[in-house]
């Protein structure tokens, strides 16, 4: 299941996903072990925490890493609220071309940012998504850029990021 709460066609951050009227949806997703992919900005993290606290069995996939800010560089203080989400074991992260090639890394760099993401969340909670065909480039080019961004990661971590995590979230992929 995917919940689109912001994006190119909806630039403002919606808050409806945390409305009490949605609680039956969250209960259903938790009871049926249905992963819920959230496309949202970091400003909605407090609402996401409320949902994860209320429904600790629901599996959440945070799309585009919620566009965590990277321009300040190490130690990525501007992304502190994002990194604080690591305590939620039900939370997984989807890394996309938006994260691999942000418009402005500023003082940040893929090597230092993704190393910190892996240290905080663990590679088994990260999964790569191509965002194809909406991303610029061929699928091969998009994959190559992602592999380059994670070249500092251990091979076993890359195995999780580029396949095993998806198989955990969607067991039919492991068959």
Question: Where in the sequence are the language-model features?
Answer:
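Short, acidic/turn-prone active-site loops that include or flank metal/cofactor-
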Residues: 5-8, 64-69
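Distinct, well-ordered alpha-helical segments
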Residues: 13-19, 42-56, 71-84, 104-115
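Short, well-ordered coil/turn segments that N-cap beta-strands
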Residues: 30-35, 56-59, 87-91, 122-126
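Active-site metal-binding loops of divalent metal-dependent hydrolases
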Residues: 65, 130-132
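Mid-to-C-terminal alpha-helical segments outside catalytic/metal-binding sites
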Residues: 115-116, 121-127, 134-175
